[in-house]
Amino acid sequence: REAVEEILELAQDNVLFTEDIYEKYIGNFKQRQTVVKALCLHIAHDCNLACQYCFAEEGEYHGRRALMSFEVGKKALDFLVANSGSRVNLEVDFFGGEPLMNWQVVKDLVAYGRSLEEPHNKKFRFTLTTNGVLLNDEIMEFLNKEMSNVVLSIDGRKEVHDRMRPFRGGQGSYDLIVPKFQK
């Protein structure tokens, strides 16, 4: 009770709070046009590995497994274009989980993004982060043509990688992905 009375007295004497030196800038800040230049699309809420350290917990992120629909991704790209102002270069990162588990939607969204470039005077830079398990010749050809960057996940030499990045059944993934990465 004594502490509450003391706090009330300090508040009444205007000595409890310091002056907000940033308050005068709030009006200008709120009036600024917000420009969005990049999006990270959580395209796959699922994964085909069971990495020991993964924050996503096999792609589940403490939730049920799911894949982003084309419609949701399309709305995201529309949002990016609508809120990019005069910025020409826009970035979209396909992330997960494992984005290649939703490959058709990735391809469709890249095609949709490309269709927006000329009419809106925009240029998309696409990036994809993958563990490499699902890579094949068709996917690699598309990635080489359409992606500005491809992030390949590997944890070091075979013993380390296989211990840290196993399949759900426990077997290592190194021997499957390294030849694909080398290709």
Predicted regions mapped to residue ranges:
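Short acidic donor-binding/metal-coordinating loop in glycosyltransferase active sites
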Residues: I43, G96-G97
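A short, flexible beta-alpha/helix-coil linker loop
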Residues: E23-K24, E57-H62, K158-E159
